[in-house]
Amino acid sequence: MKKLHVFGAGLSALTLAVIATSAYAALKDGTYETTAMGNNGEIVFQTTIKDGRITSVQVVNSSETPLLGQEALSELSQKIVDWQTINLDAVSGASKSSAAILQGVNGALIQAGGSAADLKSIPVFTQLQPGILPDVRTDVVVIGAGGSGMAAAIEAKNRGARVILIEKQPNVGGTTLFSTTSFTAGGSKLQMAADKPFTAEDFHRKLLAEFGEDSANLKQLADRSGPTIDWLIGLGADLTKVINDSQHVSPTGKALGTVVVPVLKKEVDRLGIDTRLQTKAENLVLSPEGKVTGVVVSSPSGRYTIHAASVILATGGFASNPDMVAKYTPQWEGYPSTASRGSTGDGLVMAQKAGAALSHMDVAGPQTVAYDTGHGAVSLTNVRYNGAIIVNRAGRRFVNELGNKNTIGLATKAQPEGVGFLIFDQTCLERGELLKKYKAQGYFVEAPTVDELASKLGIDAAGLKATLKDWAQVYATKTDKAFGRKDSIFSAINKAPFYGQKTSPANQVTFGGVTRDTEARALTAAGKPIEGLYVSGETADQFGHGVSIAITTGRIAGEYAAKHALGK
């Protein structure tokens, strides 16, 4: 593969050349790797050119901010392929990320044989007119290439099945990519080697206490979570630090999604799994007997059917679909989303049409501390897990900051203006890379004293100082009599400088989904399995914690879908 490094301040979107088909028809076929400087460092791109068209733009490596830079890269890569041009406006709030991808593709076109003269600005938008393409056949098709879908595809492939993995967005990762906290589990090798082992049974009890409803699926999640995190670590995921008994985190404080997604993507590539990006599932194919036998998909190249013995729906939840939020979780209507833009409930709709039942659709796990950057909401959950507290305008705590997400979200919603304030100190900040990165991006208000921080945030200084005095006692005794917090008590919050930020809830995780059994089979309202249809991750009805649900249930779905497809 040929490589070109693109440096400098870069061209603006308005001055970048428009590449019409006639202008680059003679470019050499191939995949070209380029780099360009984004907001948080260099970004690596791979641009594929075939038969005079840009057929793919992939982001190979990026440290851009989730929901801003990362989403801008996804959006523009799709537009470049769909419209066959790099004369595009920057995505609002992500100008550096936008400029980087336009530079990167421009560099690839030059490397493929283009010249400055070829890349002249002409207002041509050559939309590809999709046609009907030949059908394809496989054993297992996985719909959705987030954490759950990739885990399912890997498991099915390892069990001998032929697998096709499709994703409607230009990049893999889904909402898993935006997770900033931890992989919760019980019975992992690290946990069992601790002075006080934390077993799968302990984890099951913890989940039951948090969600209040037991099921065979909840027990299975607890039992399988330990082997799943062991598997991820074996693939190279650096989640080798355990905090608060159940949470596996990066020792350096990296965001969970940026650790997990690249590892899964690497394994998908190593196994040679047929991955088709910008490929949207339109509807499931059903036999006269009601079996699911495939899926009709559309891509920039055309529309076709993938026939498969097993279909896995791993399309995520519906946190980014305002209409579904209003219908199923109206308590969070009008709040922004910190989930992937692809979390629009597609799989739930398809499953219902195939006869599947939905359960617990009114239960959501909102992002409890979202910060409005002015360009979108960003999760600051990682701050809670590094020792912060949450207070209201009076400077007083009002909830267990590490409790049930829904409880925290509703408690925050009930405060004046529906907001809370994260409060923490330098000790908390120094615990991980992500908090330092957030500080550099201007996400925190900083002050040398508690009084000045309170003034900047607009909260009562006397109330905040009284709260911090109480918190010092919680830190000293590791006992929170007021709210029962037991986890992440890492700082007395007394080391200057002090930090804070106004936050509010946001839509992120939806727990309701397709009713399923412990073999991941979608069930009808009568409890009958729908042959050939499997569900995982947020698409499934499953209580638990985001990425732990995604990867664990993904592997379960991949296992049983492969067994069904291969007749085992």
Which residues make up each language-model segment?
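Beta1/beta-strand and adjacent pyrophosphate-binding region of the FAD-binding site
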Residues: 130-148, 164
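Conserved N-terminal/central alpha/beta ligand/cofactor-binding core
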Residues: 87, 91, 162, 171-274, ...
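A glycine-rich dinucleotide-binding beta-alpha-beta segment and adjacent secondary-structure elements
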Residues: 58, 283, 463-543
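Glycine-rich loop(s) and the adjacent beta-strand/alpha-helix scaffold that form part
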Residues: 299-370
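An anion/pyrophosphate-binding glycine-rich loop and adjacent beta-alpha core
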Residues: 348-350, 356-461
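A conserved FAD-binding loop/helix module that cradles the flavin
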Residues: 326-349, 539-566
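Active-site- and interface-proximal helix/loop "cap" or "latch" segments in soluble metabolic
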Residues: 26-123
